[in-house]
Structures are given as structure tokens and as C-alpha cells.
């Protein structure tokens, strides 16, 4: 009954934990760097050129890729099993996974080529290759598609079970997905309107002009700001 959903869940969560493991391996390198032990030259053969490149890969894999893929996989499993119903449109969930994985691959290329070294995740006005932002946007959009698939399934379940309250786990999963979609709208807007060089920048609304409005931001090195923030939190 849940064969398709279980396979998709396995793919989502499998990708999530692979990303987590790889990201975690880069974490100690940052600690050792601050302790005066620079191991990055030994990693250049596998594409890791510097502390800041490793920091970006670590942030993307742990904070974004792991979170997004795990959420979509877990909520798909929780919703369908709680409703005791297979997905209304299985192809929607398959499409979501394909879009997310394609986005991950597109993002990985500039990351490994040192074309997206923009601190922990992405910090404008540092500039990455457009493919980096496009790939991450696809990951977010894919997670939205998963959410739509869950809503379609819940709507079908409601029609089949009139007057029956939605099971708590399914209800919580759907609310979580709706909140996720609302919260990630800002990420997608930042990618499309500020970071990706698109037609928007032709009319003077790109990130360059936005940040030039503030002299302090314009002349401050983002790396120094980031390190200062980390030090302040400690």
C-alpha cells in the first residue's frame, strides 16, 4: 500500500543523512583551523581549497540540504501512514524528489569548483556562481511540490472520510509543511531578486544597488562581519 511512499521516504532521508555525514566531516577542519592546524592543502586533490570553501559546503549540507530533504521525506511518511492512505498523486512526489536532487547536483558543481565560497550558506554581498543560487532555489521549489502532494492526499482523504477529524500526526505534518512553505518564500525571493543576476538587476534592483545604499555595509568585509558575529555568540 505504501511501497511508493516508503521508497521516496528512503531516498529523501538517505540523501539527507549522506549530506549530514559529509558536512560533519568538514566541521572538525574548522576547529583545527582555529587551533592553528591547517589541513586544507592536503584536501585540494578532492576539491576543498580553503577554510571558507569548507565552511560554505558544511553550512549548505548541514543547514539546508539535510534539513530540507529530511523534512520532505519524514512528512511524506508521517502523513500517508497517519491517514492510512497512499498518495493521491504519486507522480507529484516523484517530481518533487527529481527537482530537489537536480537542484542539489547543480548546487554541488560551483561548490566543488570553489565558485560559491560565500560563508555559512550564503551571505550577500559575497557573490557566487548563478548556478549555486539556481540549484538551491530548485531544492526549495521541490520541497514545495512535496507539500502540494501532501495537501492533495489530505483533500482526497477528507472526501473519503466526511466528518472525521484529521489524525493528529497528519494534521501536525501538514501544518509543519505549510509553515515551511511560508518561511521559505523569503529564501526563494532573495535568490531570485537579489542573488541571481537576472533581468531584475537590469532595472537597478539587484543586490549590488541594495547594499550600496548603506555605506557601512558596502565597505565592511562580510567575512569579518561573520567572524565577529560568531565570536560575539561565543
Stretches found by the model and what they are:
Residues 47, 159-162, 195, 204:
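Short, flexible coil/linker elements and helix-boundary hinge sites characteristic
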Residues 5, 158-171:
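Hydrophobic, small-residue-rich membrane helices and short re-entrant helix-turn-helix hairpins
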Residues 1-2, 82-88:
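Helix-loop boundary elements of multi-pass alpha-helical membrane proteins
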Residues 42-44, 120-124, 197-217:
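Membrane-interfacial helical/loop segments at transmembrane boundaries in membrane proteins
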Residues 1-9:
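Cytosolic juxtamembrane amphipathic/interface segments immediately preceding
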Residues 9-37, 49-82, 90-116, 131-154, ...:
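Hydrophobic cores of alpha-helical transmembrane segments in multi-pass integral membrane proteins
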Amino acid at each position: 500500500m505504501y511501497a511508493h511512499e516508503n521508497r521516496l521516504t528512503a531516498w529523501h532521508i538517505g540523501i539527507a543523512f549522506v549530506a549530514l555525514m559529509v558536512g560533519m566531516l568538514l566541521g572538525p577542519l574548522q576547529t583545527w583551523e582555529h587551533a592553528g592546524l591547517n589541513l586544507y592543502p592536503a584536501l585540494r586533490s578532492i576539491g576543498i581549497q580553503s577554510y571558507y570553501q569548507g565552511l560554505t559546503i558544511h553550512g549548505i549540507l548541514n543547514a539546508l540540504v539535510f534539513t530540507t530533504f529530511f523534512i520532505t521525506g519524514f512528512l511524506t511518511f508521517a502523513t500517508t501512514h497517519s491517514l492510512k492512505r497512499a498518495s493521491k498523486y504519486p507522480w507529484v512526489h516523484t517530481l518533487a524528489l527529481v527537482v530537489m536532487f537536480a537542484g542539489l547536483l547543480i548546487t554541488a558543481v560551483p561548490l566543488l569548483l570553489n565558485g560559491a565560497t560565500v560563508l555559512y550558506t550564503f551571505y550577500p554581498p559575497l557573490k557566487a556562481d548563478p548556478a549555486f543560487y539556481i540549484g538551491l532555489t530548485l531544492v526549495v521549489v521541490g520541497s514545495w511540490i512535496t507539500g502540494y502532494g501532501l495537501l492533495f492526499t489530505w483533500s482526497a482523504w477528507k472526501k473519503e472520510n466526511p466528518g472525521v477529524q484529521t489524525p493528529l500526526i497528519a494534521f501536525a505534518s501538514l501544518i509543519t509543511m505549510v509553515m515551511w512553505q511560508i518561511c521559505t518564500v523569503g529564501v526563494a525571493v532573495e535568490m531570485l531578486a537579489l542573488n541571481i543576476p537576472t533581468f531584475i538587476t537590469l532595472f537597478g534592483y539587484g543586490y549590488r544597488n541594495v547594499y550600496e545604499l548603506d555605506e557601512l555595509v558596502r565597505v565592511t568585509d562580510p567575512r569579518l562581519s561573520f567572524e565577529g558575529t560568531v565570536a560575539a555568540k561565543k
